[in-house]
């Protein structure tokens, strides 16, 4: 839980992130920031990131037909980063404006996601759904 709290807090305060969602084994572990309470179901973009184990950056969601996948986080997010936790989950970060995330924001998210994945795999982070904070 501390890992989820610390990492999501840092993303929301040190990057242009407006919302953070952590998905692990088909369960939403964390919703934080400006976020709706609609059920989140991973769509084609999230599943592709998990399958390929590569971060997907939607710098301007208005240009992507699959953007509705993220409306369950927050309607009309202008930018989205989907960072896989292997093939079992993902950290999804919504940004305040189009093209708001820098390369260093993306690298920081990838580093934290690797650390979070390791913690989840060894059971240090217990998967209990969390309300937004």
Where are the regions that the model predicts?
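Short acidic, glycine/proline-enriched loop segments that cap or flank alpha-helices
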Residues: 4, 69, 99-100
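Glycine-rich, often proline-containing surface loops adjacent to acidic residues and nearby aromatics
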Residues: 25, 87-91
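Short hydrophobic beta-strand micro-motif common in sensory/regulatory domains
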Residues: 76-86
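Juxtadomain coupling helices with adjacent low-complexity linkers
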Residues: 91-133
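Intrinsically disordered, low-complexity terminal regulatory regions
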Residues: 1-30, 122, 126-127, 131-133
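Short amphipathic alpha-helical segments
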Residues: 3, 7, 41, 104-108, ...
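Regulatory sensory and allosteric helical modules in signal-transduction proteins
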Residues: 24-78
């Amino acid at each position: 839980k501390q890992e989820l709290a610390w990492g999501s807090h840092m993303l929301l305060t040190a990057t242009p992130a407006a919302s953070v969602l952590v998905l692990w084994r088909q369960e939403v572990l964390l919703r934080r920031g400006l976020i709706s309470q609609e059920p989140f179901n991973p769509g084609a973009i999230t599943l592709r990131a998990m399958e390929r184990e590569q971060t997907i950056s939607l710098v301007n969601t208005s240009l992507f037909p699959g953007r509705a996948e993220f409306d369950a986080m927050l309607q009309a997010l202008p930018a989205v980063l989907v960072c896989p936790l292997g093939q079992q989950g993902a950290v999804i970060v919504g940004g305040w404006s189009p093209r708001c995330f820098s390369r260093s924001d993306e690298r920081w998210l990838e580093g934290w996601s690797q650390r979070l994945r390791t913690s989840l795999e060894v059971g240090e982070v217990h998967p209990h759904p969390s309300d937004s904070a």
